[in-house]
């Protein structure tokens, strides 16, 4: 392995600067003269997406075959970090086989609002659960010599305007909700890299945010790896390098190199800043390349498919089972209805889309099972178009069966990178079908496919509801076995399912197209809000049924944790997920009514009992004191609550905890709405009290960060024309039921990304000329663009000639 210190002495400043940006869409720069290899980076979080031909960052072009595991949102329902580690190891093995050094995942965004179109890529609304699962994935991936790259750091909760939105969040909420998952992942998973998010956080882009990248990530958590930009996510490359950003991707060309050289010359940054970033990048390059050179070029596809199936089994959640309709008895005459039974929906759209090695089909698995499948009907148009003939045929088939298996869900474009959902509803034609089929045969099992929450006002029309989530390429076999009892579904929800979307604290303002995204609800996302506000939900966080039952007893507790006995009181084997929550009554702080602090899985045979221990760590009682600017503990009496869900608390013990807090964080500040959890409509005044400063102005500016979707604000006919064309194309794609992801990306893309995504064809100087044009300086802007274009071509050619020998 190369000695980084010696290598830094050999490299010229220009060569050093060149190494800090990519060469191609998914490749870093190599310098053979200095023995520095080029390495591959690749999506994705639940399956490798290495494109053999022309590469893109949106999943538009085909990739090499790989195993598609259940999405993070599905695996989270298993509450099994060890399973995550197994999946991670398989992902790492496939990445190594394809010579990929950095795998871009897992996703750790907090599920602030279920309309986020990319929720299927993320684990949970709870940072502790998300962090534990992510740490497992990271350990698994890196066990194969491949670097994991958890993402998107940080406070990135919507796809709308994702490259230029400013997340306005108070420091306590930032620390306790949006950073804790990353903290756990970094400290317990030790990732070699981490991906910064597109957005700003409190006025500064995440990728150049010293508070995030240096003070917290490196100084507090001890991270010593590489920070990699999201694709096209660099704003000020020099400031990013100074404040902790290591590698700019994908391929900004020579302009990025010249930006760093000019910054060193002007004193904006120093060569030691460049060296510090290379000291993070080069060990990753050499270590992963050496591991990959020794790795096999093949993997056991059958074994990985089997793992994907087991993961899908553990991730199934039984949400309803009226009259114990499930499991279905062998020989039962069943009608299979629904397009998803024949054409599976098993993954989301966008950069995580995998070209699966194989895909199981539920209808085929049911036909091969012990059930008597009397027929199949499509039942509904997948994309929502009403079809009376399909519905009529389905009802006729249902009337002949002992039971109906009805497969419902969201279609492919409903959940995607680059696009937020418009509502939580299933297509009306599916709901109409369910109601019609229920009139013909009430014994209905709904198998539901989605990557996130859906509203279920139709729940009374079915006797059983099995949530299959997005179960990956082997999910169909898991569902079939669960329906007949070969598998006992024991998963539990990793996010709250509300009665209606309007019940969610951020509902009124999501997903805003304003520049500022105001996190007015503070700590109260997911169950933290619903339990504090005592608001009813459809299915609570941590909820899930089973074909058996469990009893909890004999709890003992202290500051280190709890122990208790769990007994399988039913007639079949099963796995229980025991959850430990912490609550503090009469707190001097505002805080959620209860918070998850650990959990345990226990698998028991009928009648078997087991004593389990659940430990508490350094995060159990802490809060971020905004006045003292540190983690502290409020002393006093706490309740340790053990339950089968956040609402189904079985056992409780009180303990006394010694405090460390020396100053009240909100002394003389009236935050009554936060103490009561009344955060559905937080006033400007109350939010400013929480922030400790005025709410930033979100007014649109015509500058490098103006998005193409905001060109209607331009003072130029050219800008209006581009905006009009993009808007029309977007509207047409929506009306067709297939929004164009490429157009959506462009619509939400800031002008500066033109210089970051075009492999050097467009420079930032050319972007500045375009900005002048849009500001109304038409002739000067055009002259600037032409001048900068010529200059860019000449300078790029000169630089590449110098670097070619490197």
Task: Give a label for each model feature.
Residues 40, 71, 247, 357-360, ...:
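A broadly tuned "polar low-complexity/structure-edge" signature
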Residues 618-665:
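Terminal connector regions
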Residues 721-806:
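Extended non-globular C-terminal regions
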Residues 646, 653-723:
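Charged, amphipathic alpha-helical linkers/stalks
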Residues 1-619, 623, 637-641, 646, ...:
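Glycoside hydrolase catalytic-domain context in secreted enzymes
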């Amino acid at each position: 392995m190369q000695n980084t210190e010696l290598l830094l002495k050999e490299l010229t400043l220009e060569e050093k600067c060149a190494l800090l940006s990519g060469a191609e869409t998914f490749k870093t720069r190599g310098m053979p003269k200095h023995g520095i290899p080029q390495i591959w980076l690749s999506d994705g979080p639940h399956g490798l997406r290495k494109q053999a031909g022309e590469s893109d960052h949106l999943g538009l072009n085909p990739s090499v075959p790989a195993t598609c595991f259940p999405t993070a949102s599905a695996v989270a329902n298993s509450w099994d970090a060890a399973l995550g580690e197994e999946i991670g190891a398989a992902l790492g093995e496939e990445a190594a086989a394809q010579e990929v050094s950095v795998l871009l995942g897992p996703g750790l965004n907090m599920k602030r609002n279920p309309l986020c179109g990319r929720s299927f890529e993320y684990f949970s609304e709870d940072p502790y659960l998300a962090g534990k699962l992510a740490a497992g994935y990271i350990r698994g991936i890196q066990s194969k010599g491949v670097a994991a790259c958890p993402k998107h750091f940080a406070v990135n909760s919507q796809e709308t305007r994702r490259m230029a939105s400013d997340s306005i969040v108070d420091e306590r909420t930032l620390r306790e909700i949006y950073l804790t998952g990353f903290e756990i992942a970094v400290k317990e998973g030790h990732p070699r890299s981490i991906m910064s998010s597109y957005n700003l956080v409190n006025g500064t882009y995440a990728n150049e945010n010293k508070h995030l990248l240096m003070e917290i990530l490196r100084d507090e958590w001890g991270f010593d790896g590489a920070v990699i930009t999201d694709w096209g996510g660099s704003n000020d490359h020099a400031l990013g390098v100074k404040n902790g950003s290591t590698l700019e991707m994908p391929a900004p060309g020579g302009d990025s190199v010249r930006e760093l050289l000019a910054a060193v010359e002007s004193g904006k940054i120093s060569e030691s800043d460049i060296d510090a970033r290379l000291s993070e990048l080069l060990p990753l390059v050499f270590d992963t390349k050496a591991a990959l050179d020794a790795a096999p070029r093949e993997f056991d596809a059958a074994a990985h498919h089997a793992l994907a199936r087991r993961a899908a089994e553990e991730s199934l959640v039984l949400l309803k089972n009226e009259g114990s309709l499930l499991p279905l008895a062998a020989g039962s005459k069943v009608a299979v209805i629904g397009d998803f039974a024949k054409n599976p929906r098993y993954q989301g759209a966008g950069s995580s889309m995998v070209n699966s090695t194989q895909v199981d089909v539920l209808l085929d698995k049911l036909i091969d099972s012990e059930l008597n499948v009397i027929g199949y009907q499509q039942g509904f148009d997948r994309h929502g178009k009403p079809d009376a003939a399909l519905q009529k045929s389905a009802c006729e088939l249902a009337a002949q069966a002992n039971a109906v298996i009805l497969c419902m869900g969201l279609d492919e474009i409903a959940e995607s990178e680059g696009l937020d959902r418009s509502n939580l509803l299933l297509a009306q034609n599916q709901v109409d079908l369910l109601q019609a089929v229920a009139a013909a045969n009430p014994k209905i099992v709904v198998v539901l496919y989605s990557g996130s929450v859906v509203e279920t006002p139709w729940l009374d029309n079915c006797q059983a509801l099995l949530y299959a989530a997005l179960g990956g390429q082997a999910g169909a076999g898991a569902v079939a076995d669960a329906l007949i009892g070969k598998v006992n579904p024991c998963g539990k929800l990793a996010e709250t399912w509300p009665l209606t979307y309007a019940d969610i604290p951020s509902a009124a303002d999501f997903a805003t197209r304003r520049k500022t995204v105001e996190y007015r609800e503070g700590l109260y996302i997911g169950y933290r809000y619903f339990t504090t506000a005592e608001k009813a939900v459809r299915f609570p966080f941590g909820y899930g049924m089973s074909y058996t039952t469990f009893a909890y007893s004999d709890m003992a507790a202290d500051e280190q944790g709890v122990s208790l006995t769990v007994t399988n009181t039913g007639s079949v084997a099963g796995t229980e997920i025991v959850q430990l929550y912490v609550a503090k009554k009469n707190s001097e702080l505002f805080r959620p009514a209860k918070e998850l602090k650990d959990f345990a899985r226990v698998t028991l045979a009928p009648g078997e009992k087991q004593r389990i221990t659940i430990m508490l760590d350094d995060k159990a009682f802490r809060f971020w004191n905004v006045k003292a600017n540190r983690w502290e503990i409020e002393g006093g009496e706490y309740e340790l609550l053990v339950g089968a869900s956040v609402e189904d608390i079985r056992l409780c013990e009180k303990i006394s905890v010694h405090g460390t807090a020396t100053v009240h964080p909100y002394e003389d500040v009236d935050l009554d709405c936060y103490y009561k959890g009344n955060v559905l409509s937080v006033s400007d005044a109350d939010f400013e009290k929480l922030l400790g400063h005025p709410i930033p102005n979100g007014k649109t500016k015509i500058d490098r960060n103006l998005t193409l979707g905001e060109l209607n604000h331009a003072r130029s006919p050219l800008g209006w024309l581009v905006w009009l064309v993009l808007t029309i194309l977007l509207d047409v794609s929506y009306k067709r039921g297939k929004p164009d992801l490429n157009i959506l990306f462009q619509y939400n893309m800031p002008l500066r990304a033109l210089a970051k995504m075009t492999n050097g064809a467009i420079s930032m100087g050319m972007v500045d000329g375009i900005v002048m044009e849009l500001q109304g300086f038409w002739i000067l802007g055009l002259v600037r663009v032409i001048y900068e274009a010529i200059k860019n071509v000449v300078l790029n050619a000169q630089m590449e000639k110098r670097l070619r020998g490197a």
